[in-house]
Amino acid sequence: MSVQATREDKFSFGLWTVGWQARDAFGDATRTALDPVEAVHKLAEIGAYGITFHDDDLVPFGSDAQTRDGIIAGFKKALDETGLIVPMVTTNLFTHPVFKDGGFTSNDRSVRRYAIRKVLRQMDLGAELGAKTLVLWGGREGAEYDSAKDVSAALDRYREALNLLAQYSEDRGYGLRFAIEPKPNEPRGDILLPTAGHAIAFVQELERPELFGINPETGHEQMSNLNFTQGIAQALWHKKLFHIDLNGQHGPKFDQDLVFGHGDLLNAFSLVDLLENGPDGAPAYDGPRHFDYKPSRTEDYDGVWESAKANIRMYLLLKERAKAFRADPEVQEALAASKVAELKTPTLNPGEGYAELLADRSAFEDYDADAVGAKGFGFVKLNQLAIEHLLGAR
């Protein structure tokens, strides 16, 4: 099937993805460093509309002002030449040894102050480049030993830092939205705000909760053995899906960062169906479809760009399959038989309270639970139809 990306698809990639040199805990890099300017041009060629980056992805840590200015100027020139945008930026608070116990929640107060300053500088650059979202991944915010971290105090410090970032953005007129990226573990033994639910609960405790949402990642949620599509549906319900990271993962193990759809394909299908078709047949999410993956260590740069194209192609193919699934009359019949739409009908009648419900004998005293319990919902048939559409068998 021929599919072609357009800017309206809003596909974006992290500079750290295609630029990953494939160095891991057990082996050295298998690829040379990628020039950010080349990354911009290559991503534009394959149909991306945006590129994102950590501060240290673009400007190496410790660079002097002259070097920094030169790199940023070259990057901006490439953006102008290609039309690529920077929809989101983020900050590296996890690589340098100073962050070995975290950034915002380090036990060392001086590290916490340094971390906030580092993020403020990245916010300045992000605003200069037109970014609308700042992602916050607390990869080192956590502990290996319960006795080593006062979690209550750590959450206080987390809140203190995020409140300051929001105030800075508003005072400077940046208008940024902030998206917390959850992850259960790795690199820390246990990371604070490990799942989408934890992060959504946390942002309600901030001074400006309307400015904060989440950036869930496929692999991160599935590392906790959670259903990613259900998590995204709840984030949408809370109106807290500010950004999304797409990749592939085979269940609860280390963070694999595979190409999107190269892990749990059926869940990827249901996710795209949710994002594109929503609960009412209209797109449920209008933000970037951001790929946060790692091109396999086995690949050279030809393979890197093939993997980048694979992410786009997988998403577009799943989008087409989901569209066909929703348009199939047999699927519509199966959905009706399964009473999927009936869940939108309020359980109580208009104006009804517990007194009226208690007075309704048909709801309990005269209710034939055995007869209703004997009826099937037809969920297996519905799922089979979904799989057949996914496989292109219908």
Swiss-Prot record:
Q: Which SUPFAM superfamilies match?
A: Xylose isomerase-like (SSF51658)
Catalytic residues in the record? 54, 57
UniProt family annotation: Belongs to the xylose isomerase family.
Q: What is its main location?
A: cytoplasm
Task: Report which reactions are catalysed by this protein.
Answer: alpha-D-xylose = alpha-D-xylulofuranose
Assembly and interaction partners: Homotetramer.
> What protein does this entry describe?
Xylose isomerase
What biological process terms from GO does the record include?
Answer: D-xylose metabolic process
**Keyword presence, Isomerase:** yes
Query: Record's superkingdom?
Result: Bacteria
Q: Could you tell me the keywords of this UniProt record?
A: Carbohydrate metabolism, Cytoplasm, Isomerase, Magnesium, Metal-binding, Xylose metabolism
Q: Which residues bind Mg(2+) 1?
A: 181, 217, 245, 292
Q: Which cofactor does it need?
A: Mg(2+)
Organism for this UniProt entry: Actinoplanes missouriensis (strain ATCC 14538 / DSM 43046 / CBS 188.64 / JCM 3121 / NBRC 102363 / NCIMB 12654 / NRRL B-3342 / UNCC 431)
| Cofactor: binding details | Binds 2 magnesium ions per subunit.
Among the GO molecular function terms of this UniProt record, one is: magnesium ion binding
Q: Which residues of the sequence carry a binding annotation for Mg(2+) 2?
A: 217, 220, 255, 257
Gene3D superfamilies documented for this protein: Divalent-metal-dependent TIM barrel enzymes
Q: In its keyword annotation, does this UniProt entry include Transferase?
A: no
Compartments, as annotated in UniProt:
Cytoplasm
* Broad enzyme group: isomerase
